[in-house]
From Swiss-Prot:
Top EC category: transferase
Protein keywords: Cytoplasm, Fatty acid biosynthesis, Fatty acid metabolism, Lipid biosynthesis, Lipid metabolism, Magnesium, Metal-binding, Transferase
Organism name: Rhizobium etli (strain CIAT 652)
One cellular component (GO) term of this entry: cytoplasm
Function: Transfers the 4'-phosphopantetheine moiety from coenzyme A to a Ser of acyl-carrier-protein.
Protein name per the record: Holo-[acyl-carrier-protein] synthase
Cofactor(s) for this UniProt protein: Mg(2+)
Length: 134
């Protein structure tokens, strides 16, 4: 069953300006080490960071909290499955909120799609509760 849906659309130029103005202070505050390593390898760094930023916003909306109630930027990280498909890994306050949303006997599956078409980046998150037996 679907227990959360969130989406976000961001102007990549905002992220470009934040990187130019604040550099590592911005990237280290908002992104996990895995996200930074992946984005810093890209020719289009700002697009990569913008997609991940949008994913975090979308995930926080799917959790129903936004970036509040103990949910922080680095509590949500974009990772790729072995197939290359992106998903989210939650820790800290985000993981606590997610656990509180799950019905007894269920585990979470977080579905994520991210895309960009300059100057915009978009993310869509669906949080699904699946029976632990599956």
């Amino acid at each position: 069953m679907i227990i959360g849906i969130g989406s976000d659309l961001i102007d990549i130029r905002r992220v470009e300006k934040s990187i130019e103005r604040f550099g590592e202070r911005f990237t280290h505050r908002c992104f996990t080490e895995i996200e930074r390593a992946r984005s810093d390898r890209r020719a289009n760094r700002a697009e990569s960071y913008a997609k991940r930023f949008a994913a975090k916003e979308a995930c926080s909306k799917a959790l129903g909290t936004g970036l509040a109630q103990g949910v922080f930027w680095k509590d949500m990280g974009v990772v790729n499955l072995p197939s290359g498909k992106p998903t989210m890994v939650l820790s800290g306050g985000a993981a606590v909120i997610l656990e509180s949303m799950l019905p007894a006997g269920h585990r979470a599956a977080i579905h994520l799609t991210i895309t960009d078409d300059y100057p915009l980046a978009q993310a869509f998150v669906i949080i699904e509760a699946l029976p632990e037996s599956l």
